[in-house]
């Protein structure tokens, strides 16, 4: 049997203020086609900031 295609991809979440990649997570492209934008804690800024999705380069 052929393996099923994986619909999830690994992404980085980058802080919009300090531009550092603080989090790595997975996303299902079929269920969530738009780019993620989450409010997460940035340990470098020591506050909650908006983190935007970046693709992981392989």
UniProtKB/Swiss-Prot annotation:
Keywords: Ribonucleoprotein, Ribosomal protein. GO terms for biological process: translation. The gene is rpmG. HAMAP family: Ribosomal_bL33. GO terms for molecular function: structural constituent of ribosome. NCBIfam families: PRK00504.1, PRK00595.1, rpmG_bact. It comes from Brachyspira hyodysenteriae (strain ATCC 49526 / WA1). It holds the Pfam family Ribosomal_L33. This is Large ribosomal subunit protein bL33. The keyword Ribonucleoprotein applies. Belongs to the bacterial ribosomal protein bL33 family. GO terms for cellular component: cytoplasm; ribonucleoprotein complex; ribosome. The lineage of its organism: Bacteria, Pseudomonadati, Spirochaetota, Spirochaetia, Brachyspirales.
